[in-house]
Curated annotation (Swiss-Prot):
<dbReference type="Pfam" id="PF01398">
    <property type="entry name" value="JAB"/>
</dbReference>
<dbReference type="GO" id="GO:0006508">
    <property type="term" value="P:proteolysis"/>
</dbReference>
<keyword id="KW-0378">Hydrolase</keyword>
<keyword id="KW-0645">Protease</keyword>
<keyword id="KW-0963">Cytoplasm</keyword>
<keyword id="KW-0482">Metalloprotease</keyword>
<dbReference type="InterPro" id="IPR037518">
    <property type="entry name" value="MPN"/>
</dbReference>
<feature type="binding site">
    <location>
        <position position="135"/>
    </location>
    <ligand>
        <name>Zn(2+)</name>
    </ligand>
</feature>
<feature type="domain" description="MPN">
    <location>
        <begin position="52"/>
        <end position="189"/>
    </location>
</feature>
<dbReference type="InterPro" id="IPR040961">
    <property type="entry name" value="CSN5_C"/>
</dbReference>
<dbReference type="GO" id="GO:0005737">
    <property type="term" value="C:cytoplasm"/>
</dbReference>
<comment type="similarity">
    <text>Belongs to the peptidase M67A family. CSN5 subfamily.</text>
</comment>
<dbReference type="GO" id="GO:0046872">
    <property type="term" value="F:metal ion binding"/>
</dbReference>
<keyword id="KW-0479">Metal-binding</keyword>
<keyword id="KW-0539">Nucleus</keyword>
<feature type="binding site">
    <location>
        <position position="148"/>
    </location>
    <ligand>
        <name>Zn(2+)</name>
    </ligand>
</feature>
<comment type="function">
    <text>Catalytic Component of the COP9 signalosome (CSN) complex that acts as an regulator of the ubiquitin (Ubl) conjugation pathway by mediating the deneddylation of the cullin subunit of SCF-type E3 ubiquitin-protein ligase complexes.</text>
</comment>
């Protein structure tokens, strides 16, 4: 059961094994990076980078850091290199920054920390450069706000190649799969061909609804996958052997209760707002009162999708709890039956 649980986690997060031949992903080639940085293919094609491969070590570090922040946003940097149209992220480290529930910014103290940390890494023979930054969006999905877009655009201007990664720790706990997204911004004078690509359906809190999608034309998303080395595989097995019982005993409905309550409160606010809007529209339509507008139908459809999403997560948590109860609650009585 322990091995199958670990395998399920790796499959959910698409963690691929890297054998000794493919452990070369961890070997930094300084000459190759200098050649790529000199050629700068991303200058000719703003959508040059299309993939991100994140090591299991970096993924765990970023997820644990995001979770430790609670309702506050946290921030860190990623180390690695580029290979063709792919970012290879080998490691990540947190930054000592002050965050709020809606934004996070690096200060002078963080800049000094970055310089010292990278110097120590190079002294130990780790030559990977900083290739991006990550931060958390507790409870409101993986996308870029206006401040995030400006931050990423500035970094791409001065130290490209660079990418932004967003992790939602609340949705990660809720689903059991790391909720992660990777993004790059377009140049200021560039308009993507084929129009604006939407961020897709996400249950975004009402307070963030106005900003969600407002800057979608300024950035694009990259496909995220994960990998592990032979050493990572051994370390993950040791960690899983230590914590797998705790994983089984936890219930996301209890662990993430505050997030669930916030979702329900936010949904009720959206329903109230949609009801007010529909009533106002019908009152202004006069004789067309019986006909609902397309915008009203769209709003109701989004609310229905969000309600179904919340209900499915709650249902999954309840079913998982019932399965664990049926598996473990009667083990003692079956193993040691008592005679009357």
């Amino acid at each position: 059961m322990e091995a199958s649980a670990l395998k399920a986690w790796e499959l959910d997060n698409n963690v691929q094994l890297v054998d000794p031949k493919r452990d070369a992903l961890y070997n930094f080639d300084a000459d190759a990076q200098k050649a790529i940085n000199k050629e700068q293919p991303w200058k000719q094609d703003p959508s040059h980078f299309k993939h991100v491969r994140i090591s299991a070590t970096a993924l765990i570090k970023m997820t644990m850091h995001a979770r430790s922040g609670g309702n506050l946003e946290v921030m860190g940097l990623m180390q690695g290199y580029t290979q063709g149209d792919t970012f290879i992220v080998t490691d990540a480290f947190r930054l000592p920054v002050e965050g709020t529930e809606t934004r996070v910014n690096a200060q002078d103290e963080a800049n000094e920390y970055i310089v010292e940390y990278l110097d120590l890494c190079r002294a130990q023979g780790r030559q990977e450069n900083v290739v991006g930054w990550y931060h958390s969006h507790p409870g409101y999905g993986c996308w870029l706000s206006g401040i995030d877009v400006d931050t990423e655009a500035m970094q791409q201007q001065f130290q490209d190649p660079f990418l932004a990664v967003v992790i939602d720790p609340d949705r990660t706990i809720n689903s059991g799969k790391v909720d992660i997204g990777a993004f790059r911004t377009y140049p200021a004078d560039y308009k993507p061909s084929g129009g604006v690509t939407s961020d897709g359906f996400q249950a975004v809190p009402l307070a963030k609804a106005a900003e969600f999608g407002a800057h979608a034309s300024r950035y694009y998303s990259l496909e995220v996958s994960h990998f592990k080395s032979s050493l990572d595989s051994h370390l993950l097995e040791l960690l899983w052997h230590k914590y797998w019982v705790q994983t089984l005993s936890q219930n996301p409905l209890i662990t993430n209760r505050d997030y669930g309550n916030k979702q329900l409160l936010d949904l009720s606010s959206k329903i109230k707002e949609a009801t007010t809007g529909i009533t106002r529209n019908r009152a202004g339509q006069g004789m067309m009162m019986g006909m609902s507008t397309k915008s009203s139908d769209k709003a109701v459809d989004k609310l229905a999708k969000e309600a179904n999403l919340i209900a499915s997560k709650e249902r999954s948590g309840l079913i998982a709890n019932q399965v664990k109860a049926s598996l473990f609650n009667d083990l003692g009585s079956k193993a040691n039956p008592t005679s009357e």
